[in-house]
Swiss-Prot record:
Pfam families registered for this protein in UniProt: Ribosomal_L28
Origin: domain of life: Bacteria
UniProt source species: Borrelia hermsii (strain HS1 / DAH)
Ribonucleoprotein among keywords: yes
Lineage, broadest ranks: Bacteria, Pseudomonadati, Spirochaetota, Spirochaetia, Spirochaetales
Family, per entry: Belongs to the bacterial ribosomal protein bL28 family.
Name under which the protein is recorded: Large ribosomal subunit protein bL28
Keywords: Ribonucleoprotein, Ribosomal protein
Gene Ontology biological-process entries: translation
């Protein structure tokens, strides 16, 4: 499956490195000059986490993003899965 969160579907994104030099006009400068833009990747912060599911009495290993882990710790795994239209059975 590669670098992808199994719950939210977050994956590697692509963008540009934009080097800037000079002081912004707001700060009293002559304005910023943008140099040559080069391609780069924004990788997802993935974590392999083991969750215990009390309804099934089993533990499940899930590859999730750090932001999904924070949300799960706030609302719980079953509520977060329902919110993202996933079922617990998909991970067994």
């Amino acid at each position: 499956m590669g670098r992808e969160c199994e719950i939210t579907g977050k994956r590697t994104m692509f963008g540009n490195n934009v080097p800037r030099k000079g002081l912004a006009k707001k700060k009293g400068g002559a304005g910023q000059h943008i140099g040559v833009k080069t391609k780069r990747t924004f990788k997802v912060n993935l974590i392999n986490k083991k969750f215990f599911i009390p309804e099934l009495g089993k533990s499940v290993n899930i590859k999730i993003s750090a932001s999904a882990l924070r949300s799960i710790s706030k609302v719980g795994l079953s509520v977060f899965l329902k919110k993202n239209c996933k079922k617990i059975e998909d991970f067994i």
